[in-house]
Amino acid sequence: MIRSRDAVYARPDLPKLKHSLGRVEMSLAGALEPRRVLVADNDPLTSRMLSEIAEKEGYQVVSVSDGREAYRTLMADADFRIAIFNMTMPNLRGLDIVRYMKTEKRLMRIPVLVVSGDPGLKQMADSFAAGATMFLPKPLTQDQLQRTLRIALASREAKRQFPHAA
């Protein structure tokens, strides 16, 4: 079991992207894009904390309380910079939504952060296998989430600038 409180786990391909970030300049289109994040967590306290931290980072937050609501939200509106899903939610699991997102062209560009109260290696591996960009064990710290949002956004911009890299 992983016990580091400040741990942020990223897919293996992210270090390559992180390395090239110094050369990435945000495009005008990227700068004008709304900074929206979808937060889906069935725990009201965690959802509120995630939303408040994202808002402090300048994001507009759309918050839902279960997987089915997250799915419906994405079907109606795919204009999110980042999605944060609890691994296990009622009605539809976070990992099931991630798998679906990776099959839809309009959704696959959205980086997904999976949060879990169970920080085991299996949960982390399952998250990455489903297509998550990052895995965050609970309890989360404000600093940890802020850093993660910045890395995920930079990763997305790098992929936009260099679509055939990594």
Protein language model features and the residues they cover:
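C-terminal output helix
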Residues: 140-150
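Acidic catalytic/metal-coordinating carboxylates
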Residues: 65-69, 86, 93-99
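Alpha4 helix (beta4-alpha4-beta5 surface) of REC/receiver domains from two-component response regulators
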Residues: 96, 119-134
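Charged docking surfaces used in two-component/phosphorelay signaling
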Residues: 48-56
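The feature encodes the CheY-like receiver
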Residues: 47, 89-91, 108, 120
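Acidic, metal-coordinating helix/loop segments flanking the phosphotransfer/catalytic sites
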Residues: 63-82
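Short amphipathic alpha-helix used as the core "switch/output" element in two-component signaling
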Residues: 72, 95-108
